[in-house]
Amino acid sequence: MLIAQRPTITEEPVHDTRSRFVIEPLEPGFGYTLGNSLRRTLLSSIPGAAVTSLRIDGVLHEFSTVPGAKEDVTEMILNIKELVVSSEHDDPQVIYLRKQGPCEVTAADIVAPAGVEVHNPDLHIATLNDKGKLEIEMVVERGRGYVPAAQNKLPGHEIGRIPIDSIYSPVLKVTYKVEATRVEQRTDFDRLIMDVETKPSMRPRDAMASAGKTLVELFGLVRELNVDAEGIDIGPSPSDAALAADLALPIEDLNLTVRSYNCLKREGIHTVGELVARSEADLLDIRNFGQKSIEEVKTKLAEMGLSLKDSPPGFDPGRVVYSASRSDYDEDQRYIETEQL
């Protein structure tokens, strides 16, 4: 079975961390199938980074207080849980915060190694008076989902090391709805609209791409049971279909001069696809096909967004504007007379 039109996905940004994605047209019923799978994957399985444990100078446990600080350790930990970080490292990384009062301590005061970034520097952590001093060492790790503090407490943890709950997921909220959409005479196709909101550490489009990659990997396991099994085939994308149509055009549709057209036909070049498969050097080897004909062909192809096999990127037809002149007409007439002889 072949879907009449390949589904397309478009992004409608709401702001930097929120976008709506529209996927259509989908076969009837596939809107809910795809929407539910993507939503659950986005909320549970997108990799991210978070603080897993910390150590505060002079503090042995989370029920302590820090001299000169307005907040107790429990309040500081609650604030640190809101820290949005990203890490390019697979192994744990240590970030530091050292501050002397009087001042407000924010995430902007954190010193992180290369590859680790704090995305909400305005986050309030603590308030110190003139006698206050705060030194915190935090461990940042990569993971996914939610991990409670009990699981972050590893055997052999040093005294004073406080494990905390870690929320790795960079996705905050995902909703979706399915509407009916029309394809030609059928009105029962699905239109899936997904609303994705993320933390500043990841763009919504990157979260969607990550979820899609995860689902492809998992569904691939099922496909491996029988790679020759029949299923629904997705048609070519509109751009691929348009390109295929252009390549199938006969060279008559290029409206070339008589000389260029006859030379190409004599060489056995009948379609645009056969023409773009040739290089400029190949065409110059054709009898009576000179540089002027080359420029004409390149200009016609550039108007279609195509080029010869060895044409340099960014060929600008505006720099070589070809138009048939009286001399070209006379040259074609001489060519025709020669051919008739």
From Swiss-Prot:
Residues 241-341 are annotated as: Alpha C-terminal domain (alpha-CTD). Keywords: DNA-directed RNA polymerase, Nucleotidyltransferase, Transcription, Transferase. Residues 1-226 are annotated as: Alpha N-terminal domain (alpha-NTD). It is an enzyme of class 2 (transferase). The keyword Protein transport does not apply. DNA-dependent RNA polymerase catalyzes the transcription of DNA into RNA using the four ribonucleoside triphosphates as substrates. HAMAP family: RNApol_bact_RpoA. This is DNA-directed RNA polymerase subunit alpha. The lineage of its organism: Bacteria, Bacillati, Actinomycetota, Actinomycetes, Acidothermales.
